């Protein structure tokens, strides 16, 4: 999932948001439309890894307690605002 996310972020300037949800295909908003990457299904572990790679212990504790977190995500030198939240199907993120 991370490789595809990095590839899309680097190569396409028209993407405004990534929608990352456990159990669903990786999705992004491009010129107002949601596009799903069917070959990349996001796992709960993918999102946990994304959180742990980008958050300190205080932020992780806050996420566990409140089920949401506004932070930032860095991938290959690119930085994004991110909102992590929990759904009935597991963690999710919009960045």
Regions found by a protein language model. Give the residues of each.
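N-terminal "pre-motor" subdomain/linker immediately upstream of P-loop NTPase catalytic cores
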Residues: 1-95
């Amino acid at each position: 999932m991370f490789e595809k996310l990095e590839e899309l972020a680097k190569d396409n300037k028209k993407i405004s948001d990534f929608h990352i949800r456990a159990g669903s295909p990786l999705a992004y908003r491009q010129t107002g439309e949601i596009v799903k990457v069917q070959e990349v299904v996001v796992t709960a572990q993918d999102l946990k890894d994304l959180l742990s790679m980008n958050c300190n212990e205080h932020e992780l504790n806050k996420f566990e307690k409140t089920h949401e977190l506004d932070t930032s995500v860095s991938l290959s030198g690119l930085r994004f605002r991110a909102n992590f939240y929990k759904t009935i199907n597991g963690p999710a993120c919009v960045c």
